[in-house]
Regions:
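N-terminal amphipathic, basic-rich helices that act as targeting or association modules
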Residues: 2-84
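AMP-dependent adenylate-forming
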Residues: 33-38, 74, 99-128, 284-288
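Conserved AMP-binding/adenylate-forming core of the ANL superfamily
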Residues: 43-48, 97, 111-166, 183-188
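A short N-terminal helical cap/helix-turn-helix that marks the beginning
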Residues: 50, 58-72, 90-112
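Short beta-strand segments
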Residues: 50, 153, 278-281
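Residue-level detector of well-ordered alpha-helical segments, enriched
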Residues: 52-60, 160, 164, 273
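Surface-exposed helix-capping loop/turn segments at secondary-structure junctions
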Residues: 62-72, 142-148, 228-231
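Structural core segment of the AMP-binding/adenylate-forming
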Residues: 170-295
Length: 295
């Protein structure tokens, strides 16, 4: 190997695109045509982008071909303040998963999934990813998941978890995730707030060259969620019984602690409940034997 090739890349220019052939050049020329302006350099484009914020970001939207079911009535309010944060692309409606999956060619590699072990590295094409996401989204719909429902994950950054996330986005549900190194109390603190109807997880986690059982923490998490839901159900029933037997008590209506308790119970009565747990088994090689696990 030549000496130059063995030198670290940090601080060295490894490639320079030809002048006039960069994607940014084509974008700048497009803005010049569509807005009848003269922007000869990148610096000119930057100045225009901060003086014509709405026009610039509309041009970016068009350039990257965002797919939307409803277009924005306004990109951003003129002279929008830094605080409170401005609302962007007002009225636009789009699906994140659709935009992620649409643009890649079928045979292009969409995901390179790696673990600590090189032999576990796998590549997934856009065609394969679309198929997996479609199947997972169909399964979520069959489980009754609708836009606005919450789907959670208690797993690692795996291909299966990515597919679950994109499927969740495809059906319009809310996604939240917790890293597998979280203990039960930390997971419960998060999930009792967001109330998932479906929980994705795994049976094992590979860390520092060893496989660690994950089912123990998962089962404890499920038990904790169900216990909280059972208590809330009992509270709701007790509240409903008291509400039915009580007369219209003006004192109760003006009693702030009672009003807060009543509001909490009414929220609990309508909150979503954990209904399904989906486990994606660890599919890498065993560190000890290089053999795939059964099941």
């Amino acid at each position: 190997m030549a000496a130059a090739e063995s030198e670290p890349l940090q601080g060295r220019v490894v490639w320079t695109p030809p002048e006039g052939k960069k994607r940014m050049d084509a974008f700048r020329e497009r803005i010049c045509r569509e807005h009848d302006v003269q922007l000869s350099t990148y610096e000119d484009l930057h100045k225009w982008s901060v003086s014509e914020v709405g026009k610039f970001w509309r041009a970016v939207w068009d350039e990257i071909n965002v797919i939307a079911s409803a277009d924005a009535a306004q990109v951003i309010m003129d002279q929008a303040p830094m605080f409170p944060p401005a609302e962007w692309f007002v009225g636009a409606r789009l699906n994140f998963a659709e935009n992620i999956l649409h643009h890649g060619q079928d045979d292009d590699v969409a995901v390179i999934a790696c673990t600590e072990r090189a032999q576990d590295t796998c590549r997934t094409t856009y065609a394969e990813l679309r198929k997996q996401v479609t199947q997972a989204a169909r399964a979520l719909r069959k489980l009754g998941i609708v836009p606005g429902d919450t789907v959670a994950s208690y797993s690692g950054n795996t291909l299966e978890n990515l597919v679950a996330f994109l499927a969740c986005s495809a059906v319009g549900a809310v996604w939240t995730s917790v890293a597998p190194d979280f203990g039960t109390s930390g997971v419960l603190e998060r999930l009792t707030t967001v109330r998932p109807r479906v929980l994705f997880s795994t049976n094992q986690v590979l860390y520092n060259g060893k496989l660690h059982d994950h089912l123990g923490k998962l089962n404890a998490t499920i038990d904790g969620l169900l216990a909280i839901q059972e208590k809330e159900q009992k509270d709701k029933q007790a509240y409903e019984a008291k509400k039915a037997s009580d007369s219209q008590d003006t004192q109760e209506a003006t009693d702030e602690p009672q009003a807060k308790k009543r509001a909490r119970l009414e929220v609990a009565a309508t909150a979503s409940r954990l209904e399904h747990v989906i486990i994606a088994p660890y599919m890498g090689t065993h560190p000890e034997s290089d053999a795939r696990p059964n099941g």
